[in-house]
């Protein structure tokens, strides 16, 4: 039997007394009064901040949104199925923040920036607030660099610049996501980090986009943030801010970023659901009064930063879905007024076989030619004018039976120019290819080609120039201008290819 010496006991007690730390910890704790539908009402959180993160007993995280006189209304970032009336809630003293870093590139994450692609954890050490203030006036400079989408109709007539916010708007199934994903594919080799935010979409649709990006090697510079249709409204509401925060990390490091929010109608619906459950007074179309601020504070974070801040940029392409082409509904008008222009996709044009179904007449870019390279400016001006005149004449020609020769010629050219704007999905064109394509159309080289052969002719011509007259593309690519030398070579190439094409067609 071991004998314990009294001195040993006393030394152990003395040591314990010396190590005793009389630290007082103050924790702000409340009690759940009511819970359900992703909303909790809590009593007793006296010193909670608006937007502060709360921790429930089962580990679920919530955000305090409604601070009322006798209770706090919080939304939960999870199911919260085990939370009961009377269970305790702890205020964390933190505002919502997410980890950020280079390691996120090529990954698929949720609104809390946690990986959902099964490729393991993402190593990061930096954090950024989910709701950061937008850069001020002095922190910005005007948009002057082009962001090429690879789509002729957009790059020629509705150009987008780095740091711009351009809305993509249209009915369901008109190719809005296709325009956005084509823009991502076209950023390959341009040193642009792309963030694709999928809000409230079918998991199958998101998987399809991710597969397309992986197949084309675009995931190497892309981050996908996804909250599917079955996700809690809180997470669908937060997803766009997560995308903006991840892009901001790169923007403030002097990099160029492109963020696509697909789509903000779903985010507004999720926010409406949260607000109505929190018993906030409904406004127009039952949306809460601050739904404009919901989108403005998100889109104002897109900017072209000043030289002092490293000249980084964040370009935002928000997507909004309309019902039966009604652009005067609440959310579409809100987002149109916040953005620097809109690309309107028409269901009628889509069904008529014009894809991408861009309605050039009511689409606009408020940055304009400042976001175009000189070569594109040289050829694009005439294209827009010819198409506008064609649209007017086409409407008139439906009523007139006998048209003069000049009008018939103009209509014939207009039909060929419209063919020129058609493009297959996931087949973006480089600037030099676009310039040569538009030049061919506006200078009458397509007038003798049958309308149904125009696309085949142009595809063959682009390949022929790349193979036999590569200097044309090289001049435009390096000088960014369409010089007389390039023009002479291009004329020669078109005439030579046209002879061969006519011979094979015959």
UniProtKB/Swiss-Prot annotation:
UniProt xrefs under InterPro entries: ATP_synth_asu-like_sf (IPR023366), ATP_synth_asu_C (IPR000793), ATP_synth_asu_C_sf (IPR038376), ATP_synth_F1_a_nt-bd_dom (IPR033732), ATP_synth_F1_asu (IPR005294), ATPase_a/bsu_AS (IPR020003), ATPase_F1/V1/A1_a/bsu_N (IPR004100), ATPase_F1/V1/A1_a/bsu_N_sf (IPR036121)
Subcellular location: Plastid, Chloroplast thylakoid membrane
Membrane topology summary: Peripheral membrane protein
List of residues binding ATP: 170-177
Matching Gene3D superfamilies: 2.40.30.20, ATP synthase alpha/beta chain, C-terminal domain (1.20.150.20), P-loop containing nucleotide triphosphate hydrolases (3.40.50.300)
Function: Produces ATP from ADP in the presence of a proton gradient across the membrane. The alpha chain is a regulatory subunit.
Subunit structure: F-type ATPases have 2 components, CF(1) - the catalytic core - and CF(0) - the membrane proton channel. CF(1) has five subunits: alpha(3), beta(3), gamma(1), delta(1), epsilon(1). CF(0) has four main subunits: a, b, b' and c.
Protein name: ATP synthase subunit alpha, chloroplastic
Source species: Chlorokybus atmophyticus (Soil alga)
Gene name of the record: atpA
């Amino acid at each position: 039997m071991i004998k314990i010496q009294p001195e040993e006991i006393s030394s152990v007690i003395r040591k314990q007394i010396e190590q005793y730390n009389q630290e007082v910890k103050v924790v702000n704790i409340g009690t759940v009064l009511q819970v359900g539908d992703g909303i909790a009402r809590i009593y007793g959180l006296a010193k909670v901040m608006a937007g502060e993160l709360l921790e429930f007993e089962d580990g679920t995280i919530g955000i305090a949104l409604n601070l009322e006189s006798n209770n706090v209304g919080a939304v939960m970032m999870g199911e919260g199925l085990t939370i009961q009336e009377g269970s305790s809630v702890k205020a964390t003293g933190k505002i919502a923040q997410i980890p950020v870093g280079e390691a996120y590139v090529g990954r698929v994450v949720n609104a809390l920036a946690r990986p959902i692609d099964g490729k393991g954890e993402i190593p990061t050490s930096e954090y950024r607030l989910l709701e950061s203030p937008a850069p001020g006036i002095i922190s910005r400079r005007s948009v002057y660099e082009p962001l090429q989408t690879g789509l002729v109709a957009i790059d020629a007539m509705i150009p987008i610049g780095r740091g711009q916010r351009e809305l993509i708007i249209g009915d369901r199934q008109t190719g809005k996501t296709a325009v956005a994903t084509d823009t991502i594919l076209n950023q390959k080799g341009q040193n642009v980090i792309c963030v694709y935010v999928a809000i409230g979409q079918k998991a199958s649709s998101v998987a399809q986009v991710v597969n397309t990006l992986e197949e084309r090697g675009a995931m190497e510079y892309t981050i996908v943030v996804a909250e599917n249709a079955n996700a809690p409204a809180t997470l669908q509401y937060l997803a766009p801010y997560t995308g903006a925060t991840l892009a901001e990390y790169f923007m403030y490091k002097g990099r160029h970023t492109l963020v696509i929010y697909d789509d903000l109608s779903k985010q507004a619906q999720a926010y409406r659901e949260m607000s109505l459950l929190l018993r906030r007074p409904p406004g127009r179309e039952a949306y809460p009064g601050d739904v404009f601020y919901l989108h403005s504070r998100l889109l104002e974070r897109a900017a072209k930063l000043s030289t002092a801040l490293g000249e980084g940029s964040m370009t935002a392409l928000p997507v909004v879905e309309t019902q039966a082409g009604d652009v005067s509904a609440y959310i579409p008008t809100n987002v149109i007024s916040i953005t620097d222009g809109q690309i309107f996709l028409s269901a009628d044009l889509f069904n008529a076989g014009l894809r991408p179904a861009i309605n050039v007449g009511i689409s606009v870019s408020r940055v304009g030619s400042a976001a175009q390279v000189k070569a594109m400016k040289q050829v694009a001006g005439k294209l827009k004018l010819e198409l506008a005149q064609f649209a007017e004449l086409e409407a008139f020609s439906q009523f007139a039976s006998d048209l003069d020769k000049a009008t018939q010629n103009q209509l014939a050219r207009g039909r060929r120019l419209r063919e020129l704007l058609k493009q297959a999905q996931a087949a973006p064109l480089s600037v030099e290819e676009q310039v040569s394509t538009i030049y061919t159309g506006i200078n009458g080289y397509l007038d003798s080609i049958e309308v149904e052969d125009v696309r085949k002719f142009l595809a063959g011509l682009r390949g022929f120039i790349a193979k036999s007259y590569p200097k044309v593309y090289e001049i435009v690519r390096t000088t960014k201008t369409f010089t007389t030398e390039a023009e002479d070579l291009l004329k020669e190439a078109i005439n030579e290819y046209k002879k061969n094409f006519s011979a094979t067609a015959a």
